[in-house]
């Protein structure tokens, strides 16, 4: 039992991170579109709700998670959220593995055009299931 997260949203908000600012435009999932997605997804609900923003969970709640495997896109507004979440889990002693694929952009799992990143995503999930 484990969680495999591809380019996850761990904080349902514009986080102002380096990746959010650096890849705000020109890399597929830009910051403005992500903002629109978040508004639609939240539909007025609290963005700090743990079901949409696991980064706001308490340490005790996070310690109850199964092993977490995070694979992010290197050129993605969400990259830093996923990596920050992984660092927090690691600091809590939770089993976690995380990487950001060099040169990849958001949606490498579901949209054609990044075959090397897609292949790594399949291998990553396969490794997590062992």
PLM regions with names:
Residues 1-130:
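Alpha/beta-hydrolase superfamily serine-hydrolase fold, recognizing
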